Curated annotation (Swiss-Prot):
A single GO cellular-component term on record: membrane
Species for this entry: Saccharomyces cerevisiae (strain ATCC 204508 / S288c) (Baker's yeast)
Name this protein carries in UniProt: Putative uncharacterized protein YGR115C
Record keywords, A-Z: Membrane, Transmembrane, Transmembrane helix
Membrane topology: Multi-pass membrane protein
Zinc recorded as keyword: no
Keyword Transmembrane helix: yes
Comment field (misc): Almost completely overlaps SPT6.
Segments traversing the membrane: 14-34, 161-181, 221-241
Localization of this protein: Membrane
Length: 259
C-alpha cells in the first residue's frame, strides 16, 4: 500500500485505467476517492517541483496502471511507466506531444509484479493482447521502476495523508460486514464479477475457479481500452448489507493527471 501511495503522490503525470479486480463494491468507491485525492496532490506537487527545479522531472512521462488476475484468483498489478518521445528532437514530435502512443512507448516500459513467480503461467495482459515476443522480452529485460526520492515537505505531507487514508479504508473494510480476509495473506474474498469485452471476443473473470478466459485477436492496447466495459454486482456482499443498486455498468476511461 505504501508503494502504491508513493506512486500516486509522485510528481509525474499519471494515467489511471479504472479497472480493479477481486474487490467489493465499497472498496471500489474507496479507490475512486483515493484517485480523486491523489490527483489534486499530484497536480500541486508537479507545479511546485517544476518551478523549483525542472531538470529533475522526466519530460512527458506517465504511469499506466493495469490490473490483471492470476490462476489462483490473487490479483496482481502491472505498473508501466511510459515516456513520450522528446519534444526537442524534431518539429513533428512537438505537434504530436498531446497524443500518447502506447506502442511507441514500449521501449521505456517497465514491469513490476507483486507475484513474479506466476508471470510465465498467468494470463497477463501482454499475453491477452498477443504482443510479439520481441516486445515481451524488452519489457521483461528493463530494470525495475524507481521512484524519485527528492520531494519537498508538501509532498511528504501528501504521501503521509494518503497512507493514513489507505489505513482508514482498510480499517473500514474489516469492520463493514460482507468482506472477509484470510489470516495468512490478508487477501479479500472476491465478491464481484468482472466482465471485459472487445470487438472480437470477451474476457471473463469471477470468484469461481472454473472461469474461462479467451484472448482477443486485437493487438492494439488503445483499441482494447476504448472498448472495455465492466459490471459489478453487489449480490454477494452479505445479508446485513444491501446495496440500492444491483449492478453498475460503465466504460473504462484513461485520464492524464498533472500537467
Amino acid at each position: 500500500m505504501s508503494y502504491i501511495s508513493s506512486i500516486l503522490s509522485d510528481d509525474r503525470p499519471v494515467i489511471c485505467v479504472g479497472c480493479l479486480m477481486d474487490c467489493s463494491l465499497k472498496s471500489f468507491f474507496s479507490w475512486i476517492l483515493l484517485c480523486l485525492v491523489s490527483s489534486s496532490s499530484s497536480e500541486n506537487s508537479s507545479s511546485s517541483m517544476k518551478s523549483s527545479n525542472s531538470s529533475k522531472i522526466p519530460p512527458l512521462s506517465a504511469v499506466l496502471f493495469l490490473f490483471s488476475w492470476s490462476s489462483s484468483s490473487r490479483p496482481y498489478s502491472l505498473f508501466l511507466p511510459l515516456r513520450k518521445p522528446d519534444s526537442s528532437s524534431s518539429s513533428s514530435s512537438e505537434k504530436k506531444s498531446s497524443n500518447l502512443d502506447v506502442e511507441s512507448c514500449l521501449d521505456a516500459a517497465t514491469l513490476s509484479l507483486s507475484d513474479s513467480a506466476a508471470f510465465p503461467s498467468s494470463p497477463t495482459l501482454f499475453n491477452l493482447l498477443n504482443f510479439p515476443e520481441e516486445e515481451l522480452a524488452l519489457v521483461r529485460s528493463t530494470p525495475a521502476f524507481s521512484i524519485n526520492k527528492s520531494k519537498s515537505s508538501s509532498d511528504s505531507r501528501s504521501s503521509s495523508s494518503l497512507s493514513l487514508l489507505l489505513c482508514f479504508l482498510l480499517f473500514l473494510e474489516i469492520l463493514v460486514p460482507g468482506s472477509s480476509f484470510s489470516s495468512s495473506s490478508l487477501t479479500m474474498k472476491p465478491s464481484c464479477t468482472f466482465l471485459a469485452s472487445s470487438s472480437s471476443s470477451s474476457i471473463s473473470s469471477s470468484s469461481s475457479e472454473e472461469s474461462k478466459t479467451s484472448s482477443p485477436s486485437s493487438s492494439s492496447l488503445g483499441a482494447l481500452v476504448s472498448s472495455l466495459s465492466f459490471t459489478i454486482s453487489s449480490s454477494s456482499l452479505g445479508t446485513s448489507f444491501e446495496s440500492p443498486v444491483s449492478s453498475i455498468k460503465g466504460k473504462f476511461y484513461v485520464k492524464i493527471l498533472g500537467n
